[in-house]
UniProtKB/Swiss-Prot annotation:
Coiled coil: none
GO biological process annotation, one example: translation
A Pfam family reported for this protein in Swiss-Prot or TrEMBL: Ribosomal_L19
Function: This protein is located at the 30S-50S ribosomal subunit interface and may play a role in the structure and function of the aminoacyl-tRNA binding site.
Source taxonomy: Bacteria, Bacillati, Bacillota, Clostridia, Eubacteriales
Keyword check for Ribosomal protein: yes
A GO cellular component annotation in the UniProt record: cytosolic large ribosomal subunit
Gene that specifies this protein: rplS
InterPro entries for the chain: Ribosomal_bL19, Ribosomal_bL19_CS, Ribosomal_bL19_sf, Translation_prot_SH3-like_sf
Organism, as annotated: Clostridium novyi (strain NT)
Name of the molecule in the record: Large ribosomal subunit protein bL19
Superkingdom of this protein's organism: Bacteria
Length: 116
């Protein structure tokens, strides 16, 4: 039974995903369906979490919009994701950056990784 599930999941896993890590600033283009129209919406922010692996892998992006923190969680293998572009590489020493939620302004910045 487990082999059947793994075989089905292996077919659906995307292989053309951009390599990114926690702390990176990314721009995610998401397909939005409004009525019968479909358009792309960009969401740019810092990756604060990557969770699980395989087909169920998700990542959370945080940005501050008009003074309010906004976090969106995206499934990596979702067909609604058009593209993931790394804008800036970040240098962090944690796998989950939840501490950024309590910081404001320059304190919420992530250092840039010079060579990665």
């Amino acid at each position: 039974m487990l082999d059947i599930i793994k075989a089905i999941e292996a077919e659906q896993v995307k292989t053309d995903i951009t390599e990114f890590n926690v702390g990176d600033t990314v721009r995610v283009n998401v397909r939005i369906k409004e009525g019968n129209k479909e358009r792309l919406q960009a969401f740019e922010g810092t990756v604060i979490k990557r969770q699980n692996g395989g087909i169920r892998e998700t990542f959370t992006v945080r940005r501050v919009a008009y003074g309010t923190g906004v976090e969106r969680t995206f499934p990596v293998n979702s067909p609604m994701l058009e593209s993931i572009k790394v804008v800036r590489r970040g240098k962090v020493r944690r796998s989950k950056l939840y501490y950024l939620r309590n910081r404001v302004g320059k304190a919420a910045k992530v250092k840039e990784a010079l060579n990665r």
